[in-house]
Amino acid sequence: MSQASSTDTPFVIAGRTYGSRLLVGTGKYKDLDETRRAIEASGAEIVTVAVRRTNIGQNPGEPNLLDVIPPDRYTILPNTAGCYDAVEAVRTCRLARELLDGHNLVKLEVLADQKTLFPNVVETLKAAEQLVKDGFDVMVYTSDDPIIARQLAEIGCIAVMPLAGLIGSGLGICNPYNLRIILEEAKVPVLVDAGVGTASDAAIAMELGCEAVLMNTAIAHARDPVMMAEAMKHAIVAGRLAYLAGRMPRKLYASASSPLDGLID
């Protein structure tokens, strides 16, 4: 990643340019109406959906999430949440492509266990390689290991999405130093995925130089999800602007704001 300039560059995923750098999930809301209102307040244009946990057409007799997040308004990003090996993940992506009429953009996540929800990077690499061969545009959830992030980009993933903290933990940016290394080496967009708990966490991720942030629980489990969604929208914008502006250097000692020359006695 090159050093920031004061001129912004577009946020492009799979050849499409987006105005919002906030991506949101659809789980954990109390009902579909709250889901709709929070997503609208967030200003997000990309919305991720857990194919194995959400009805997007595979169950005709049940409420369809796509009725409240219509694909003509949002880019639907099907994800493989709940998959624990490469075979499951690939199968889920193929199902999503069938349900969404040939839609190739997917978010790959292969989990290691139910307690930590850490990514299983071995299975993630296997699944990513197969999905890229199958013609999918793969955005991939991964650890904050810079080597794994590099390998996923080399395989052909169009974006790498390292965790900032455990999924659903709200712990914030636990290891900014690894994220900085990933960002310095990045040849594809880097998005923080998981760990964000409040607006300041999102701003920090953007100040580090991430292209975007994906979140769900931070909004859905807030006391007022719709208000938090709006807060996150502004945090993403503020963080990006701060990154482009360039923060002042950190100093050990004070530095007076006003010059000492010409002081009135």
Curated annotation (Swiss-Prot):
1-deoxy-D-xylulose 5-phosphate binds at residues 168, 194-195, 216-217. It is found in: Cytoplasm. Disulfide bonds: none annotated. One of its GO terms (biological process) is thiamine diphosphate biosynthetic process. It catalyses: [ThiS sulfur-carrier protein]-C-terminal-Gly-aminoethanethioate + 2-iminoacetate + 1-deoxy-D-xylulose 5-phosphate = [ThiS sulfur-carrier protein]-C-terminal Gly-Gly + 2-[(2R,5Z)-2-carboxy-4-methylthiazol-5(2H)-ylidene]ethyl phosphate + 2 H2O + H(+). The keyword Transferase applies. GO terms for molecular function: thiazole synthase activity. The active site is at 107 (schiff-base intermediate with dxp). Keywords: Cytoplasm, Schiff base, Thiamine biosynthesis, Transferase. Pathway: Cofactor biosynthesis; thiamine diphosphate biosynthesis. InterPro entries: Aldolase_TIM (IPR013785), Thiazole_synthase_ThiG (IPR033983), ThiG (IPR008867). It comes from the Bacteria. Its EC number is 2.8.1.10. One of its GO terms (cellular component) is cytoplasm. Catalyzes the rearrangement of 1-deoxy-D-xylulose 5-phosphate (DXP) to produce the thiazole phosphate moiety of thiamine. Sulfur is provided by the thiocarboxylate moiety of the carrier protein ThiS. In vitro, sulfur can be provided by H(2)S. Homotetramer. Forms heterodimers with either ThiH or ThiS. Belongs to the ThiG family. This is Thiazole synthase. It comes from Pseudomonas paraeruginosa (strain DSM 24068 / PA7) (Pseudomonas aeruginosa (strain PA7)). The gene is thiG.
